[in-house]
Amino acid sequence: MLKLKKLQLLGFKSFCDRTELKFPGDGIAAIVGPNGCGKSNIADAISWVLGEQSAKSLRGIHMQDVIFAGTRDRKPTGMAEVSLTLIDPEQYEGKIVEPEIEIRDEMPDDWDEAAAREASMEEVDEYTAEVQPGTNTEAEATEQQAAPSEGAAPTTEATAPSTENEAAPSEVAEGQPSDAQAAVINPNAVVLKIRRRKFNTNRFKKGEICVTRRLFRSGDSEYLLNGKLSRLRDVHDIFMGTGLGPESYAIIEQGRIGQILSSKPTDRRAIIEEAAGITKYKTKKRLAEARLEDAKSNLARVNDIFDEVTRQMNSLKRQAAKAERYAKLRDEMREKLRVVLASKFALIDAEIAGLEAELTTVTEEIATRTDAVQQMDNEHGERVQRGYAIDAEAKQNRESLNNVSREMDRAAQRRRTNEERCAELVARSAGAEAEIQNTTEQLGRLEEELATNRQVLESAAADVAVAQSDLQTKQQEASAAAANLMNVEREQEQRRSQIFQAVNAASNVRNRITQAEERIANLDREHGRVTGELSSATLQLESFGGQRGQLGLEFESANTRVNALSSEITDARGSLQQKRQEEIEAKRHVDTLRAEYATLLGKKGSLESVINEHGYSTESVKRLFQSGGLREGNTPAGVLADFLEVEDKYEHVVEDFLRDELNYVVVKSWGAADEGLRLLKGDVDGRATFLVHPSDSQAKFSFVLDESMRLPFTPDRVTPMKNCIRVLNGFGKSLEVVLPKLGNGYIVPDPAIGRELALENPDAFFLSQSGECFHNVTVTGGKQRSQGPLSLKRELRDVMRCIDDVERSLRDGEARVLMLGKEIAELTSLLQRLEDEKREGEKQAMTSGHTLRQLENEMARVRDRHATYERELQRVSNEKSERENAIGGLRMELEAAEARHQELEAAMNAATQSLDELRTARDNASHAASEARAQAAALEERHRAAASSLQRIESMVQEVSARIGKLKGQVESAAAEKQQRESENETIAEQLVTWTAEREAAEARDRELQTESEQVRARIAEIEEELKTARQALDAARDRRGELHASVARLQSDGEHMAETCVQELSVTRPDLMAIEELPRLTGDELAVADTEQKDMRTKLENMGPVNMMALEEYKETAQRHEFLETQRKDLLDSIENTQNTIKEIDQITKVKFDEAFAAINENFGKAFKKLFGGGQGFMKLTDELNSSDSGIDVIASPPGKKLQNVLLLSGGEKTLTAFSLLVGIFQYAPSPFCILDEVDAPLDETNVARFNELVKEMSMQTQFILITHSKRTMATAPVMYGVTMQEPGVSKIVSVRFGEEAARATA
């Protein structure tokens, strides 16, 4: 069995200093001392270190009351610490009996109680700071992770229950945070600092157990087992079943012996259960019941989730079946679509092949006609070539003339510039010479200033040396004065020590007054604290009332929210179905627009190909553009048709009338036209007409409009052709000069009017809208050409507008599809969120209801605490009145003591005058030294300023010298430049004479070339008329070829659209599809039937509505989750069943153990009762014998000669003996390592004290007894005695004495 070895206290109640009590291994130890000295604090310390959670049981209000609160001479400590050491004699390796404390009967001469007190306080503060919990460093955190068993989270005892009924269970007490706390606290955020401790783990020996408990004023608390941090539960586990557990019967505190009889039957049962060793089974049962409740709660949540997942799985199962049907029908539709597309591709390829064969024939015909036209173009080109040669020579001559004129202008400008520069150089040289003279004078003045500053620098250095010597002398004088002052102050300190000794005589009286005042102050603080706690409890009750109302509202609100969410979910599902139907319709519309867009793109490509390749032009023009010979600056701007736009109703009329003119090649210069003619004569066969753009400087004079050539009138029935044509890119009205037919052309409403006007105006051309052209006595007509350049471009513009419209509609449609997809996604997300909110609301409603019930229980506990605070307020008020009455007498004693102190102070002041004179002398010497130091610093600063000024002047001298050299160089360079410019002007005058003669010769040659050019142009116009007829036949063939090109382009566009459909629908390209040989190629009715079937399948797919293709995968995942939840549900059911079986087994074991212990203790109780009373009868009985598991225990006691029905009718002494008899019965059945009895013998008379002591001696053979007593008989029975004194007010001290050896020697 364990034995109590040692008890250490620090800062616990009145034991502010480190105090140690060493107990013998067995027998009896007595603790004695006067009332109020702190004897019972030792018993409280042992109860506290073993885990007592009730501040009331420790004679306090709050748990912080156990921390030393301070006195007049001592400040409060920062913590309370108690360590309890027990040993196992069979395994302990050290000494069981410690050496005695040496007690001396006299004080040493140098003993200083104040110094000893101060040293003790410092030691306590240092130790408190050392063990104070805090945030760990990185190295300490690593150490803590390496040894997790040595650390535990700090706990707070500020909120510990203050009554026995409110004591927290060990499972959630200090050192073991609850589940809610564990969910909030981050385990890595704040940890307990790993720190060095005075009780290191390596000091404990085998067979030794040391339990330590600490409580800090911050509210942090910790438990240690053999120096390692542990939990309260660990401490309870060690002592559970030994009589030292939570229901301890081994520690009988002052006044508690009678409570054993007056307590409730259920409380007495707890003592018997502790003795029977079933407390640990009770704890296990309580934990098992808690686990059972948690498992049931988890099962309820799992059942809810299981039901929800089951419903979700059934829904997904239906969606998965629909998705399977959809996928099957979609695969059939795609297979049918593959056959249809492959057949259509084959038909399109065959039709394109036929058109390309016809296109080849038409191309050969065009080549034949082109050769015929080419011969005539060659003849026309020879005539044009001479005109180009003349134009080139004229151009070169004009360029030479322009170059000469530019050179003459530049030479004149250069000569004027040189003359101005020469005048500027003369003025600059004069200014530079003047600046050189001024700078030379400045250099002389700077050299004089430099010499003066050097003399000042030498003088400043000498002054600094003298000031340093004077400073050293005055510093020595100041040091001597300070030494004299120090000697006198030492003598004065000796006098002050004498006064201090006199003050100590008065301090004893003042201490008593201060203690009384402090007690009143403490009572005031306690009154304020209790008032605050009362107010806090009142506010807490009010707050709980508000919270209860709030929780009720939250519960109702949660239910209302769940109902509202159900309605919103129904609406969201309806909106989602509608949006999905709109999305299907929008996608169908987008597919139609894409097909139309592909057709328009094909048509646009065909038209652009014909226009870009100039398919409407002559072969010569086409080959000229295709050859690429005209590059860089000679690139053609296009043909004349590119510069004209005509109203739609006049397009065919203008195209037939200006058939040849529209093919004119527009170039930017005559050089480009010459290069084109060269190509037509060489690499490119054929003829062409070139039109020079008005931007050319030579051609612009040919485009001046002669208004005199116009008809004198414009009939109202006639529309001038120029009004129907809009000319682009710089031609404007000047195009009428180049094309006389344009200025003389008119459009009439019918042929009769045209014929009549043609006879009246033989120079004009009159065109009817039916295609006839009347000129003088000729008329031209016939079938109109199908398409010309103007109509092709107009058609291209129409196609481009259609493409823009379709693109806009397609973008809108795609945006609509995207918007609907986004809305569907948002609605899906909203639906999911609403369902999540609904589930969360259901959980919140459940949580609110549970919290509401907890709050009502908490309100009941707060009401009980409120009543306790009211009773405590009354007690504090009564004690304060008693203390105030005692202060009056103490103040009279204090006045006499202070008078003596004032006499000693007067003597001290008389000796202070000489000390003031020495201080004045020291201050004067220090002041003189400071002035000398300041003067030396000023002279040093003057020396530094002189050196800096000298350096600045030397820098200026260098700069001025450099400036003089630079100015002389500028004067020399100006003279050289003036001479060079005068020589250049003479050369320019000679060149001007030569350039004047060259310009006159060039002007004469230009006039000759202009005359010859006009003659050549007239001949070219005659040749062009002959080409007109041949080109008309060629244009008809080209029209047919254009139609064939358009047909091929249309078929290719259809093929591209189907290829895009193939990729989008089948995810396969056209070549890959055509490579599949096993696909049948349908034609005619078979193809139409297959196409209809695949469209019907597509319609069925669309009619199926939205299909969740992810349902298959979601169904699998939900099924797996369903299976997992089912497994979890089964595990919880098994856990609940196992826990219930465990509780039943615990109930059976505890019943057997209790019955056995009850019978044995009852028998021992009866024997001890008879022994203490000398007869009589005492026994226990169950209040409910039919239900022994939960029955309370009643005590029946009948002393000799009495027959009592209630133990409460016994006297105080009889109650004590009866209760002690019960304790003896318990100890005889289940002895505890030690037993503490606090003034249990107080109510007993001398006879009963003797009996009591005799029984204690008998029991001390097995159990170690610690008796706190005032009885001399009891003291005599103890071989070891501890005396508790309070020499210093409010501070308890311990003195121990062993009597056993002295008694043995006396007997010998």
UniProtKB/Swiss-Prot annotation:
Kindly list the positions annotated as binding ATP.
Answer: 34-41
**What are the record's GO terms for cellular component?**
chromosome; cytoplasm
Boundaries of each SMC hinge domain copy? Answer: 637-757
Compartments where found: Cytoplasm
**Chief place where the protein resides:** cytoplasm
Cite the InterPro entries for this sequence.
P-loop_NTPase, RecF/RecN/SMC_N, SMC, SMC_hinge, SMC_hinge_sf, SMC_prok
The entry lists its GO molecular-function terms as:
ATP binding; ATP hydrolysis activity; DNA binding
Q: Which UniProt keywords apply?
A: ATP-binding, Coiled coil, Cytoplasm, DNA-binding, Nucleotide-binding
What's the short name of a Pfam family annotated to this entry? Answer: SMC_N
* A GO BP annotation: chromosome condensation
User: Gene3D superfamilies in the record, alphabetically?
Assistant: 1.10.287.1490, 1.20.1060.20, 3.30.70.1620, P-loop containing nucleotide triphosphate hydrolases (3.40.50.300)
- UniProt region (Disordered), positions on chain: 115-181
Give the coiled coil ranges. 278-600, 791-1046, 1110-1148
**What spans are recorded as compositionally biased (Low complexity)?**
137-169
Q: How does it assemble?
A: Homodimer.
Quoted from the entry, the domain comment is: Contains large globular domains required for ATP hydrolysis at each terminus and a third globular domain forming a flexible SMC hinge near the middle of the molecule. These domains are separated by coiled-coil structures.
Which family would the database say this protein is a member of?
Belongs to the SMC family.
As for what it does, the entry says: Required for chromosome condensation and partitioning.
Q: Which PANTHER family match?
A: STRUCTURAL MAINTENANCE OF CHROMOSOMES PROTEIN 3
* Protein name per the record: Chromosome partition protein Smc
Which species?
Answer: Koribacter versatilis (strain Ellin345)
The UniProt gene name for this protein comes to smc
